[in-house]
Amino acid sequence: MNNNKSRVVLVTGACGGIGKALVNKYASQGNTIAIADKSQEQAHFLADEIQKRGGKAAAFPGDLLDKNYCDNLTKEVQIKLGAINILINNAGLMRRGDITQATDEDFELSMKINVEAPFRLIRAVIPLMTKAGGGSIVNVSSCWGVNPGPNHLVYCTTKAALAAMTRCLGRDHAHQNIRINAVCPNEVNTPMLRTGFEIRGLNPDD
């Protein structure tokens, strides 16, 4: 990334462990941050924190389970901040269990957060990036989306779907100067990991 040029960066799950680390890093490089998180209080607090440090940020709180929120978020960011140069689909849900323990709710919620929300956001942002001459999209998948771990069937399945979707999108839109990639972190010490797994991982800033 060229740190000499300010970009508008939209981050989902922006107030969680990895999300907040991404927000702070991009803000420190002079970028304008669109903070998308389900917690209205935390989203505005994080935006205020960045502004107090001399950075640029705006809060766009909402629930990724809400299709209207997903479909309209990019438009709202575009109107308020003027562009979306980078979209980071960071929000995620981890539910533990094998197939005998996984519930319909586990599967449906995980698919909506881990797969459908990125799908809707990307579908909405592609025309904006195309019109602007390009952009970058990053999907936060997981190493378990590539090499599944034990006792996390639903999580591994949805992250594998996100990784496959990323590969398809990358091929389809490279000619529009839109880079679409997935990052597949190992265990990172975040609240989501602590609720779904016993192993303590790296810190988000590492």
Task: Set out the residue ranges of the language-model regions.
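Active-site loop-to-helix junction immediately N-terminal to the catalytic Tyr of the SDR YXXXK motif
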Residues: 102, 148-156, 168, 196
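Alpha-helical segment proximal to the catalytic Tyr-Lys
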Residues: 127, 171-175
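Active-site helix of classical SDR
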Residues: 122, 158
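Short, flexible catalytic-loop segment of classical short-chain dehydrogenase/reductase
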Residues: 185-195, 199
